[in-house]
Design a protein with these regions (language model features):
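Short Gly/Thr/Asp-enriched flexible loops that form oxyanion-binding sites at enzyme active sites
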Residues: 149-159
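Glycine-rich anion-binding loop/nest that anchors nucleotide
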Residues: 137-148
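Hydrophobic beta-strand scaffold residues
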Residues: 52, 163-165
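Glycine-centered short loops/turns at secondary-structure junctions
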Residues: 47-50, 134, 160
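Hydrophobic/aromatic ligand-binding patch that stacks against planar heteroaromatic rings
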Residues: 44, 103, 129, 155-157
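Internal catalytic-core helix/loop-beta-alpha segment
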Residues: 90-139
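Active-site acidic carboxylates
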Residues: 1-107
Length: 165
């Protein structure tokens, strides 16, 4: 099998009440809308033996990996990264909001890629995991299509992967 499914950022901070997106004033019902379709896609991929990977956007507890422009954008949106929210510190690794949503939990053995930025390839070992498994084709799904999904897609295309969104 040369294909892999990457599920981008289906975490509480984006898809649950009290998370980062909710605190920033986004309509989380729109972010939750694709969950049933992603569940179907996951089931189909798993049934066919396709490698499934999950990503989570988040930062170190000390925010040492948070670039200043991203910090300012989040602050201007009304949801400063690292500030306390109902699900813990917003977009911080190890907090409740950083966890993947219950509906889309990884199975044992499915890699979870923690990323500090928008692309799942930036500052992660994703490319190494894919190359070591002979993956050449990617199916990419998830939330914040215009941000993290597209950033990952563009990086993947630049790295020579055939991609389906």
């Amino acid at each position: 099998m040369t294909a892999a499914l990457i599920v981008i950022d289906m975490q509480r901070d984006f898809c649950a009440p009290g998370g980062y997106a909710d605190q920033a004033g986004l309509d989380i019902s729109l972010l939750r809308a694709p969950i049933p379709a992603i569940q179907d896609l996951l089931a189909a991929a798993r049934a066919r033996g396709v490698l499934v990977l999950h990503t989570r956007e988040g930062h170190r507890p000390d925010l040492s990996d948070l670039p200043e422009p991203k910090r300012r954008r989040a602050e201007n949106a009304g949801a400063p990264i690292g500030s306390q929210g109902p699900l813990g510190k917003l977009l911080v690794r190890g907090e409740c909001g950083h966890d993947l949503i219950d509906e889309l939990q990884p199975l044992p053995g499915e890699p979870v890629i923690d990323k500090p930025g928008y692309s799942a390839f930036a500052a992660t070992d994703l490319e190494l995991l894919l190359r070591n498994r002979g993956i050449t084709e990617l199916i990419i799904t998830g939330v914040t299509t215009e941000v993290c999904v597209h950033s990952t897609l563009r990086s993947a295309v630049d790295l020579g992967y055939a991609c389906t969104l």
